């Protein structure tokens, strides 16, 4: 399904024409703090406090009541769906009372990415649908530095919402921050070891050469070859 067709399917009458993301922005400011888990520096989330905050219900309601088909520009679509993914990943953790890893919310035959995560415009969605059917087809590999699946090895959850007017700067900053982290982004000079994200989604970066160019652009230095990948730590990025 094309991106246009997918987004067109979200047009539902009588829904809000603009997303109210102020509750999500307040949640990110209140409940995301820098810390360390398993020796990895990252932004940690206080899931208990987030779930008890009345703004969480308000943020979920804003998604459910918003007609995503009204999003006009590429930047509006990209910012909205990154915010939606990150909020719904947190919702999965809270709803399923996950303590160890977000993957614990899934089952033997249905991984967590394919279970219902929440509602957008009155329609039930999964994290898999948002990532693979909406965000990845938009063609910007920096999404992989911005969407956060509630795990230690994920890029850091940004303590603010993504907004169309600042999206380029925000995504560049996310890429630079992630690649500056030697425990989960990249380590080495010349021959480098990378996040497993660059292995899983190599094609999104334009193949191996595109990965090397991306790393060189956002981290700098002489990047010649990928020597391997970090083990992915799926432990919850919790406070």
Explain the meaning of each model-derived region.
Residues 11-13:
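N-terminal signal peptide c-region/cleavage motif recognized by signal peptidases
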Residues 1-6:
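N-terminal export leaders
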């Amino acid at each position: 399904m094309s991106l246009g067709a997918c987004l067109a399917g979200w047009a539902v009458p009588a829904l809000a024409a603009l997303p109210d993301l102020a509750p999500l922005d307040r949640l990110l400011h209140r409940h995301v703090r820098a810390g360390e888990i398993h020796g990895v520096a990252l932004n940690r989330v206080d899931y208990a406090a987030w779930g008890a905050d009345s703004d969480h219900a308000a943020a979920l309601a804003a998604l459910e009541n918003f007609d995503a088909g009204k999003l006009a520009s590429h930047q509006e679509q990209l910012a909205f769906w990154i915010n939606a993914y990150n909020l719904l990943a947190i919702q999965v953790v809270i709803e399923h009372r996950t303590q160890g890893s977000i993957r614990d919310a899934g089952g033997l035959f249905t991984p967590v990415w394919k279970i219902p995560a929440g509602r957008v415009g009155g329609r039930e969605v999964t994290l898999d649908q948002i990532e693979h059917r909406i965000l990845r087809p938009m063609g910007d590999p920096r999404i992989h530095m911005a969407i956060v699946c509630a795990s230690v090895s994920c890029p850091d959850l940004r303590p603010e919402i993504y907004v169309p007017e600042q999206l380029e700067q925000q995504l560049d900053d996310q890429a630079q921050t992630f690649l500056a982290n030697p425990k989960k982004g990249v380590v080495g000079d010349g021959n480098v070891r990378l996040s497993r994200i660059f292995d899983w989604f190599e094609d999104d970066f334009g193949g191996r050469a595109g990965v090397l160019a991306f790393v060189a652009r956002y981290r700098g230095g002489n990047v010649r070859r990928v020597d391997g990948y970090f083990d992915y730590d799926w432990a919850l990025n919790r406070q």
